[in-house]
Amino acid sequence: PMPFQADRLQLNNMAFNSPNTEWDLSAQKVTGGVSPWQPEAGNVLGKNAQIQMSAGSLTLNGVPATNVLIQGQLNGKEVVLNTIGADMARGSLTGSALRNADGSWVIDTMRLNEIRLQSDKSLLDFFAPLNTIPSLQIGRLEVTDARLQGPDWAVTELDLSLRDLTLSK
């Protein structure tokens, strides 16, 4: 444990950076709190805490977003995101999800509206991150009017509804 801790860490219009970690994170205009706050080496938020934060801008593992809202909790290596909301790729994302301790994801609900995303990756490389997680379970995924484009591939006016899908290695 670090030599300091608090019942609650309150952030007001702060910058938050966590490079060279499992989640490469950079956020600006962060307001919110972590309760209790018990930081550890390599884990600035601690292992067990309630989190509630908003950020004017945030980049997570190279993916930028603005007007971000996150509510959830950290339970050891498990991350529960009860509420996620963000503007990204000229559209919006809302949902709730759980990342298990083994790195697998359970997406209870996710809605992507009017996403406009251009990538320099081939279609195979674009979906390659899905191969890095042990499993992905989707309760409900709704995509409305999405446009995705890369070299030699494009998807336009995509409307998609998925329910009860599991992808596993």
Task: Briefly describe each language-model feature range.
Residues 79-81:
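Repeated loop/turn-to-beta-strand initiation elements of outer-membrane beta-barrel proteins
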Residues 1-68, 74-77, 91, 96-169:
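Membrane-proximal interfacial segments on either side of biological membranes
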